[in-house]
A protein has these predicted regions:
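Conserved N-terminal entry element of GNAT/NAT acetyltransferase domains
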Residues: 1-5, 162-171
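Short hydrophobic/aromatic beta-strand or adjacent loop that forms the aromatic wall/cage
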Residues: 36, 142-147, 170-174
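Conserved catalytic-core motifs of GNAT/GCN5-like acyltransferases
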Residues: 102-104, 120-148
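Conserved GNAT acetyl-CoA-binding A-motif
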Residues: 93-107
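Conserved acetyl-CoA-binding loop-helix of GNAT-fold acetyltransferases
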Residues: 72, 78-91
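Short alpha-helical
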Residues: 2, 108-109
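A conserved beta-strand-loop-helix scaffold within acyl/acetyltransferase catalytic domains
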Residues: 4-71
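Conserved active-site tyrosine of GNAT-family acetyltransferases
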Residues: 114-119
């Protein structure tokens, strides 16, 4: 299996692991795949973990990143791969002067893990993330779980409280299949 096929397979496993249905996966692949920045962690020449990120500006003019689909193959878990993917993505946004990161955990277990790596809960706030074509990108998420955020600089004091984050149409990145 070639590298690109391996990454696409990893992405499909990521969606399947949180119960995202096939029609959303197909729509996502067609519309959003090239708009996202993908972080991939390799173990040798095997893609062992993946995470996607969309950049946005919220209604207050603050710049953020939306993390989505963090997934590590089961045989590579508990080796720091997920933490490394998060760290790389945070460093990328920090260097580009972004304000915060937001994500919606898919389970109570993942919420505990995100807390361990520095994310905080947005108290009693449930958000929706809408893509540039109106697709709700929070499909497949446990809607009872609150969103979480990570501040990218010390003077960040505005906890994001928007109910809806809209992802603008973005240029495609170099990562294509």
């Amino acid at each position: 299996m070639d590298f690109e096929t391996s990454i696409l397979k990893l992405l499909q496993e990521s969606f399947a692991s949180i119960g995202v249905d096939g029609s959303f996966r197909e729509h996502y692949s067609r519309v959003y795949f090239n708009a996202m920045t993908h972080f991939v962690e390799l173990e040798g020449d095997i893609p062992a973990g993946i995470m996607q990120m969309l950049r946005f500006e919220d209604s207050r003019g603050l710049r953020g990143g939306y993390f989505y689909g963090l997934f590590t193959l089961p045989q590579f878990r508990c080796r720091g791969i997920g933490r490394g993917l998060i760290s790389d993505a945070i460093a990328t946004l920090y260097c580009d002067s972004f304000d915060y990161v937001v994500l919606i955990p898919h389970s109570a277990e993942s919420m505990r893990w995100y807390r361990k790596v520095g994310f905080e809960t947005i108290a009693d706030n449930h958000i929706s993330v809408l893509g540039f074509d109106g697709t709700n990108l929070t499909t497949g998420k446990d809607n009872s779980l609150p969103a979480m955020y990570y501040a990218l600089h010390d003077n960040f004091s505005q906890i994001p409280t928007d109910n809806v984050i809209k992802i603008p149409q973005q240029d495609c990145f170099d990562f294509e299949f």
